[in-house]
Structures are given as structure tokens and as C-alpha cells.
């Protein structure tokens, strides 16, 4: 492993990519420490602590923003507006034929237009979420008294939140283009990991104070370790369909005749279903939390609280839905079957064309179901334990199954991206 890092560092182009990625991450963390003007940050921190919001949907937002949400910094909204915009645009690409054609047939130009629409949507959603956050702070007297009713202060706060979310989106795009890995995923990874030390300290303090049994904490960390091993194994798992290429003569040379396989990953959509399911499941509870008279309403406490069974069921079904949704976007059986047919390939036992695509679709449905259930079970297990025991600490928002899946998944994706860069230069990678 150390030799691999040394090899990566020796490659000038790769070294520049790594340094650029680290620089963007540093800028992001610095932005997380810059407070928005006119906000009473101490009162806001006390409100989050006293209200127990660290174990609610807003606490989840706080984890995904690296603690910026509870401190009302310029990056408080984090990547939430971008995630929500991506969900909306990709759903519209299925519902609106013009957008679907643009996505599938537009080539690079079409992808650029879709990306541009997503950017504008991110800004619009950022404005809405910034306004909602401002209203929450105003309703709970978390804005400095001298500026509580000041229109100018409201405009500055909302625009600062919106600009911060747009800047995060831009930083993520820069990492994707000039750095290593997917920029948005890396920003999310950094945000979650940044909260781990605070979570560990809080849990150790709970043990010292007698609020949590030491053996429960040990079991939690052993479970987290086993979960990491399981995630690594499943992320590498794939179903390989045998493919045979028929022989063909071109001029005086004979081509084809070799056997290969078509790899289909079990967890094809990665961590995206969980990220998107969180955003959708959190939307109603977020609206309720931002309106004081709704915060203790029946729907908030009995349906959209993370420790209630209705929320767990909704969250489970959303992960299943987005797993299938993204598998259909990333892997098209008809397109794969047509490409095999054009190149003289076929799956033994199935005729080229429609029979092949139907078989691939059948296999895809099976492995997607397994991957979806795997993601769902890991994500909701801490919530089920909490719902049964009524111990909110066991929801493990910052060290729970959801966060571990995201962190390990992004880490593996980034390592593979770095390995691909190294293999292009004839060096052994991390996973070799």
C-alpha cells in the first residue's frame, strides 16, 4: 500500500490531481468555518443541543454538511440543493420526452445542457431552502435582535446560503474535472468524516456518565467494522454473463471466436439511492421543523420522525425505488444486446437481439433486487434498533449504517479512480 502511494506521488500529473483535490477540500472546510452575518451562532448551537435535533432529520443535515448547518456558516446547505435538483431533473428526463431525447441522443452537448439545467435548479432550490432556514432562525429568535426584522439582513442571509450551495456545486465540479474521483461524493465524504470525532467523544462521554453501557458501545463499533467488511465485499461483487464472439473473416485475417464475459455489478447504483432517499424522506419533516406550530404536530412525531415505523417503511421503499431507478439509467439491456449483436457477440443459449435483452433484463432485475434490499437493510437497521429500544443514541446518525455505506462507498470509488489513473501508466493499483 505504501509503495502504491509512493508510485502515485511520483507521477507528476497524478500528484497535481491529488494536490488539487486536497486544496478544494481545504477550501470547503474553511468555508464551513465562516459564519453567515447577523446570526447569533451561540444561540443557534444551544438550540440544536437543547432541542435534541442531533438525532433528527435536521441532525442528519448537520452531519451531511460537516457541522455547518448547526453553525449557520456559508456552506450550511451543503450539497442538499444539488442533490434535490439532480433528483428532480432526472425524474423529469423520464417524464418529459424532449428531455429524455436530449439525455439519450444529445451526446456531449446534451449532457452539458442537462448539467446546465441542474445548476440553475440548484440555485432555485438553494433559494427556497435558504429562505426556509432563515424563517426557522427568525421564528426561534436565533438572529441578532438588532436585525431580526431587518429586510436587508434577511436578503443577505438568504443570498449567502444560496451562494454557498452554488459554490459547493462548483467546487465539486472542479474536483470531478481536474482532481480525483467524483467531486460531489468527495465533499459529502469529507462532511461525514469530519463529524466522526465529535460523535466518538459524545458516545464515550455517555459511557463515562452512565447514559450508555460500555458493552453497547463495543457492540456498536464491532458492528460498524463488520459492516465495512460487508460493504467492501458487496461493492466488488458482480454477476458475469458468458459472452461468445463468432468468427468472421475480414480480408485475409480472421477475427473473433474468443470467449469473454459481461460484468454486472450487484450494487450498480452505489450510494446514490441512499443519498436521494434521505433527501426525499426528509423533505416533509424539514418543512415541519421550519414552522414552529408544526414541529410538534402529529405527522412530525408519528410519521416523519426517524425513530417511527412509518418513516422506516417510507425510507426502505424509497431506497428500493431509487435502486431500480438508477440501475435502469446506468444499464440498458436493449442497448447492450444491440451492441453485442453488432460486434458478433452472443450469450450461449440465447439468440441475438430481443431474447438476449430479455435475459439480461431478467438478470438485472434479480441482482438489483438483492442490491436494493442490501442497501435498505443496512440503512434502516440502526433505525429499527432505535425504534424498538427507544434509545435515540443508537440511531447512530453520524456513525450509523447510512453514513458508513456512503463513506466506504465513496472511498472505494475514489480508490478505483486513482487506480485507473495508475494502471494507465503501468503501475499496480491499490486493489491489485
Tell where the protein language model's regions lie, with residue ranges.
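N-terminal cationic and glycine-rich segments that engage phosphates or anionic surfaces
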Residues: 1-432
Amino acid at each position: 500500500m505504501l509503495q502504491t502511494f509512493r508510485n502515485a506521488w511520483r507521477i507528476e500529473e497524478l500528484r497535481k490531481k491529488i494536490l488539487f483535490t486536497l486544496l478544494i477540500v481545504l477550501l470547503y472546510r474553511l468555508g464551513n468555518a465562516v459564519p453567515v452575518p447577523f446570526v447569533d451562532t451561540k444561540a443557534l448551537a444551544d438550540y440544536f443541543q437543547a432541542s435534541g435535533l442531533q438525532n433528527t432529520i435536521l441532525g442528519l443535515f448537520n452531519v451531511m454538511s460537516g457541522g455547518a448547518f448547526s453553525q449557520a456558516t456559508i456552506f450550511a446547505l451543503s450539497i442538499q440543493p444539488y442533490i434535490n435538483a439532480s433528483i428532480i431533473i432526472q425524474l423529469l428526463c423520464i417524464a418529459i420526452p424532449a428531455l429524455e431525447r436530449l439525455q439519450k441522443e444529445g451526446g456531449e452537448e446534451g449532457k452539458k445542457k442537462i448539467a446546465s439545467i441542474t445548476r440553475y435548479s440548484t440555485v432555485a432550490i438553494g433559494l427556497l431552502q435558504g429562505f426556509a432556514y432563515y424563517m426557522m432562525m427568525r421564528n426561534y429568535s436565533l438572529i441578532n435582535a438588532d436585525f431580526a426584522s431587518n429586510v436587508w439582513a434577511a436578503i443577505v442571509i438568504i443570498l449567502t446560503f444560496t451562494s454557498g450551495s452554488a459554490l459547493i456545486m462548483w467546487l465539486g465540479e472542479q474536483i470531478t474535472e481536474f482532481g480525483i474521483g467524483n467531486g460531489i461524493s468527495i465533499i459529502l465524504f469529507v462532511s461525514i468524516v469530519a463529524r466522526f470525532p465529535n460523535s466518538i467523544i459524545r458516545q464515550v462521554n455517555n459511557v463515562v456518565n452512565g447514559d450508555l453501557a460500555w458493552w453497547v458501545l463495543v457492540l456498536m463499533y464491532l458492528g460498524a467494522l463488520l459492516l465495512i467488511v460487508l460493504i467492501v465485499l458487496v461493492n466488488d461483487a458482480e454477476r458475469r454473463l458468458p459472452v461468445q464472439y463468432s468468427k468472421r473473416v475480414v480480408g485475409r485475417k480472421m477475427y473473433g471466436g474468443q470467449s469473454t464475459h459481461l460484468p454486472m455489478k450487484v450494487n450498480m447504483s452505489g450510494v446514490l439511492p441512499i443519498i436521494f432517499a434521505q433527501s426525499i424522506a426528509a423533505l416533509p419533516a424539514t418543512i415541519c421543523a421550519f414552522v414552529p406550530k408544526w414541529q410538534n404536530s402529529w405527522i412530525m412525531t408519528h410519521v416523519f420522525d426517524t425513530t417511527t415505523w412509518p418513516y422506516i417503511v417510507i425510507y426502505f421503499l424509497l431506497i428500493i425505488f431509487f435502486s431500480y431507478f438508477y440501475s435502469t439509467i446506468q444499464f440498458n439491456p436493449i442497448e447492450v444486446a444491440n451492441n453485442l449483436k453488432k460486434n458478433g457477440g452472443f450469450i450461449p443459449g440465447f439468440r441475438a437481439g430481443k431474447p438476449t435483452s430479455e435475459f439480461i433484463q431478467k438478470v438485472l432485475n434479480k441482482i438489483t433486487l438483492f442490491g436494493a434490499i442490501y442497501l435498505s437493510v443496512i440503512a434502516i437497521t440502526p433505525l429499527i434498533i432505535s425504534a424498538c429500544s427507544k434509545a435515540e443514541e443508537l440511531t447512530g446518525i453520524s456513525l450509523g449504517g447510512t453514513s458508513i455505506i456512503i463513506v466506504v462507498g465513496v472511498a472505494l470509488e475514489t480508490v478505483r479512480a486513482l487506480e485507473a489513473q495508475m494502471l494507465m501508466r503501468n503501475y499496480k493499483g491499490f486493489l491489485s
